[in-house]
Amino acid sequence: MSVDTYTETTKIDKLLKKPTSHFQLSTTQLYNKILDNNEGVLTELGAVNASTGKYTGRSPKDKFFVSEPSYRDNIDWGEINQPIDEETFLKLYHKVLDYLDKKDELYVFKGYAGSDKDTMLKLTVINELAWHNLFAKNMFIRPESKEEATKIKPNFTIVSVPHFKADPEVDGTKSETFVIISFKHKVILIGGTEYAGEMKKGIFSVMNYLLPMQDIMSMHCSANVGEKGDVALFFGLSGTGKTTLSADPHRKLIGDDEHGWNKNGVFNIEGGCYAKAINLSKEKEPQIFDAIKYGAILENTVVAEDGSVDFEDNRYTENTRAAYPINHIDNIVVPSKAAHPNTIIFLTADAFGVIPPISKLNKDQAMYHFLSGFTSKLAGTERGVTEPEPSFSTCFGAPFFPLHPTVYADLLGELIDLHDVDVYLVNTGWTGGKYGVGRRISLHYTRQMVNQAISGKLKNAEYTKDSTFGLSIPVEIEDVPKTILNPINAWSDKEKYKAQAEDLIQRFEKNFEKFGEKVEHIAKKGSFNK
C-alpha cells in the first residue's frame, strides 16, 4: 500500500510542533542536553567528545537513491549509486516518522547549504540526538537569528535516527543501517548509524545532483584565496596533503571540503569544517588545533578522566574527527566565496615513485586526471611487507557524485577554458623508488612547488616533456633540487623506473575502461604519453 505526500507532510509538521521538539537551540543549550543525556563528555579543550559506536565512518553499501520517474534517467546507477523503489522508501520513512513521534525529545535545526544566494539550499534537520543537532549547526550555514530560522521553508529535510534499526527483510535495506535520498520527496533519511558525517555527505550528494543541473560545477576540494584575490583549489583523496597544503597562514580559507563554481566564482557549500583529528598537534596543524574549543565536537577520540585528549590514540578508529564552525578559524573569507580560480592543484600520493613531483596539465590532461582521481594506498601486514595499491576515485570523491562522471568533467573542462585556469598535478608521494625503497617527497619541497604554482611563477616557466608520461615538467623551481623534478633522475636503476611507470600507466588505462565510449575523446587527448 502506498502512502501519500500529504500524510508525510502532516507528520513532519506534527513532529516540529511537538512541545518536546527543541527548535534552534543555542550551542550552550545543546551542550547542556549532550551532557545531561550522557551523549558525550566535556574535554579540557572546551569541545565535547562523542562516540559513534560501531560505525566510525560512512556506510557506502547502505546508501540509496530513490528511483523516481523525474530523476532516474539522470543518475549513474551502479555499486555507488544504488536504487531503491519509492514505495519501499515511503514505508520506511513513515515507520521512522512514527518512531520519532514516540520519542521524548527531538532536536530541530534550520539552516542552509551553499553560500551563494542564488543556489542556496534551505534545510531542516531533525535529530534524535542533541550532539547530532550540534553537528548540523556546526557544519551547515547558520541563519543570523532564530527569527530568520523560523521563516525558512526547506528545500530539503534531513531525518536522522541513529537508534532506529532497519529490518532488511521487511524494510528493503541491506542492513540495519540506511542512508536514502529522495529528490521527489526532498528528504535524506538516515538510520542505524551514529556517524554524523552521513548528514554532511548526504547534503553534498544532493548538491552534486542539483548544481550541475544548473550548469554549476560542484567539487570535492578545499579552496583558499591570496592577498591579491587569487583563488586556488586543491583536489585530492585522503592522505594526499589536501588539508595541510591548503592551510596557509598567508592565504584565507574559503572552505576545506565542498565547493561550487558558478558564473560569479567559487563558493563554499558548508558553514563548518570536519577535520581528521588523528595525530593532531598544535605544532603540525595550529589552525585546526586552535579551532577545537568550546562549540566544537570531537568524534571517537580518547579522553582521560581529567578531560585531556590523546589525539594519537586510535583504539576506536583511525578516522577520529573534529567538527567545528568555520568561524573557529581566524584566517577565513566572510562570506565563504571568492572569484574564479587562477590555479587548480590535483594532489596524488604516488607510492610507486614514478609520477613527477609537479607537472603542468593542459585541459584534456586535467579532465583525464579528474576522472581518474588517482592516489595509492598502502596495504600493510604484520610482517611489515607492504606493496602499494593504486586507488582510483572518480572526481576525487566517487561516493558523493550521483550523475555520470562526464557531466562533472565536461563542466570542469569548460570552466578551465573559459577562465584560463592553470592546472598542476602534484605528487606528494615517493621519489627515488617505490614505497619501501624510495623516500617520501619532502613537505618543504612540495610546499615550495605549490607556492610557486599558486603565485603564478610557473605559468610561463620553461618546461620539458618527460618521455614516459608525456607530462610537462618545470626545468627548475626556486629552492627545489633539479634532481627530483624529473623522477627518472632520482632512481638509480632507470630500467626499474621504466617498468614501474609502464605498470602504472596500464593501471590507469584499465581503470579508464569503466567509463566506456563517453570518454573516448578524453582518453585520446588526455591520457599519458600523448
Curated annotation (Swiss-Prot):
Disulfide bonds: none annotated. Mn(2+) binds at residues 201, 220, 257. Its cofactor is Mn(2+). GO terms for molecular function: ATP binding; metal ion binding; phosphoenolpyruvate carboxykinase (ATP) activity. Its EC number is 4.1.1.49. Gene3D superfamilies: 3.90.228.20, Phosphoenolpyruvate Carboxykinase, domain 1 (3.40.449.10), Phosphoenolpyruvate Carboxykinase, domain 2 (2.170.8.10). This is Phosphoenolpyruvate carboxykinase (ATP). One of its GO terms (cellular component) is cytosol. The gene is pckA. It comes from the Bacteria. Keywords: ATP-binding, Cytoplasm, Decarboxylase, Gluconeogenesis, Lyase, Manganese, Metal-binding, Nucleotide-binding. PROSITE patterns: PEPCK_ATP. The keyword Lyase applies. Pathway: Carbohydrate biosynthesis; gluconeogenesis. Substrate binds at residues 58, 195, 201, 321. Binds 1 Mn(2+) ion per subunit. It is an enzyme of class 4 (lyase). Involved in the gluconeogenesis. Catalyzes the conversion of oxaloacetate (OAA) to phosphoenolpyruvate (PEP) through direct phosphoryl transfer between the nucleoside triphosphate and OAA. Belongs to the phosphoenolpyruvate carboxykinase (ATP) family. One of its GO terms (biological process) is gluconeogenesis. ATP binds at residues 201, 220, 236-244, 285, 321, 440-441, 446. It catalyses: oxaloacetate + ATP = phosphoenolpyruvate + ADP + CO2. The keyword Cytoplasm applies. It is found in: Cytoplasm.
